[in-house]
Amino acid sequence: VIWVVMLIIPFVPLGLRAFGLMVWILISGWYAAFLFAVLQSAAAGEQELPSATFSRDLLDDLVYPLFQWIGSWVVVYIPACVYLLLACLGGNVDPFDALRMAFGGIERVFQQGGGQPPAFSILVCIGAFFWPMIILCIALGGFETVYRLDLIVSTIIRTFPVYVLTLLLMFGAAVLERTLTASAAGVSMRFVISVGLTVYFDIVLMRLIGLYYHHFKDRFAWSWG
């Protein structure tokens, strides 16, 4: 069901713009809410995946989860974006190139790392390194927990081998997803496979992050129960 729903998103803007944007927000929010539920259920030690349902509170069940998901990436990429802003003001980077780099994120760094400012690439990689912990904090404790960098860094140090393993699995899944998608014949088939793999690996990643907390929460600098 999730796979089919996610296939709809790229075609939504082809209709009325305002209506299309609203539908995109609802579908993306629903998907983000499901991913957060997967992480939270794994963190609680539950074996089964949560159901992809929501109540009729659109703001709390759809809009806010999407805001949290986007916000998690904004938080980790703030240093890189500040660097781009300063580079643009200094005339070292074209504003349009800066926008492309900012929206490209970690994928663009790996694809065109040599064509981007080294400082920007380093800051993006540092942000991606912290993302699993940031999304975990937001999912379990809200945005107010991401400001405690001392606790975040302390927790990563205490669980460093497992945290690095989680990161390697995250990037490995991304590489595998891209490889399998590229091997498919035909643009339409690649699109369908890409969406399916994205959904699958997103679920796996959220489970991994949740289980990371469940099994090693005694080493965390704080606790959510």
Question: Which role does the model predict for each range below?
Answer:
Residues 1-9, 36-57, 220-225:
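N-terminal juxtamembrane cytosolic/stromal segments of multi-pass membrane proteins
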Residues 1-14, 169-173:
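Hydrophobic alpha-helical transmembrane segments of multi-pass membrane transport/permease proteins
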Residues 6-10, 75, 128-129:
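Hydrophobic alpha-helical transmembrane segments of integral membrane proteins
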Residues 50-67, 148-160:
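Membrane-interface segments at loop-to-transmembrane junctions
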